[in-house]
Amino acid sequence: MSSLAPWRTTSWSPLGSPPSLEDALRLARTTRAFAVRRDGEGRALVTYLYGTPELFSLPGARELRGIVYREEDGTVLSRPFHKFFNFGEPLAPGEEAFKAFRDSMVPLFVAEKVDGYLAQAYLDGGELRFASRHSLNPPLVGALLRKAVDEEAMARLGKLLAAEGGRWTALLEVVDPEAPVMVPYQEPGVYLLALRSIGEGHYLLPGVHFPLPEALRYVRWEPRMDFDPHRFRGEIRDLQGVEGYVVTDGAEFVKFKTGWAFRLARFLMDPEGVFLEAYAEDRLDDLVGALAGREDLLRAVARAQDYLAGLYGEAVGAGDALRRMGLPRKEAWARVQEEAGRWGGFAPAYARAAMAAYEGGEAREAFLVELRKRSARKALEALHLFPRVGGELRG
């Protein structure tokens, strides 16, 4: 196995020795941005909880992305992906880095990004073990791995690592149709993304640096001799159902995301808030377009839309009926309040629309005013209409 040339003109390199356990624990003690997870068996995992350009500029910080140590002697057992960025972000390689490759005619390698849950496989005392970015015993990723990987694939993975003396980490992405992130997959699967040298930090790509492993799925890395980041970003911008692509030289990585992925990511961060904003501004058609390919989310949007339509219809019907009855306002308000209680957190929206209809005013606008409030987002969240991204943090 041999590595590619390291990325040029970048201010930081993932090559070289990993941060020591002492340095990792020091960072965890001095900032709340890092956490230490222990498994009770002598292993410690250090990872970031959130990050900023300033934080990731600290020495060793980009390596603390789920790195696993043996606490007794500080040995690094597993070295996962370092933190890397989208093209255009402050710490990502810029145009000058790509130009250096074009000028020297050294290839870069491009692969479609697998959109699942990142996992790492490593050997400890000859035993194959798995971890996620946040846990040595990941409940979600562990369950998905057991579901997607058969014994033959597990054995092949163990042999692949053992053949290299156990000083490599296998970097994996786990996907499952029952736990989608953004891109929907038809069946469970585990994809081998790369191997990483624990001691030296460089990466080996399947099909580029070592033969494609039998019984294992893998990403396909395609060489590009004349890679232009701006042209490439334009090529993929309008792709639907694809999160994006990753470009590497075997040391540094850069992400290129599609417009669809950025829009969907915004929705997944706050589905209730984004839905209510689109509903109140009559932009549901745009939202539906942004969710193309995610039938589960489209069904959730339809359910939420039907729920609000039913709520509004009942409120206006009640207000109109009270007006026709000729009830005084105080009595009408009392009846509206009694009925509104059935709608839980949406009671204010019901009451305001009903009273606007009772008074012959703009019931729709009154209804939308309430939907723009934070309390409406909480009320919609309580209905559990929108599926959540899997129960573990990602990053």
UniProtKB/Swiss-Prot annotation:
Q: Which enzyme type, at the first EC level? A: ligase
Q: How is the cofactor bound?
A: Optimum activity is reached at 5-10 mM for both Mg(2+) and Mn(2+), with Mn(2+) showing slightly higher activity than Mg(2+).
Q: Which domain of life is it from?
A: Viruses
Residues that bind ATP: Y48, R65, K83, E173, K255, K257
Keywords of the record:
ATP-binding, Ligase, Magnesium, Metal-binding, Nucleotide-binding
Output the Pfam families linked to this UniProt entry: RNA_lig_T4_1
- Protein name, per record: RNA ligase 1
- Source organism of the structure: Bacteriophage TS2126
Lineage, highest ranks first: Viruses
Which gene is annotated as encoding this protein in its UniProt record?
RlnA
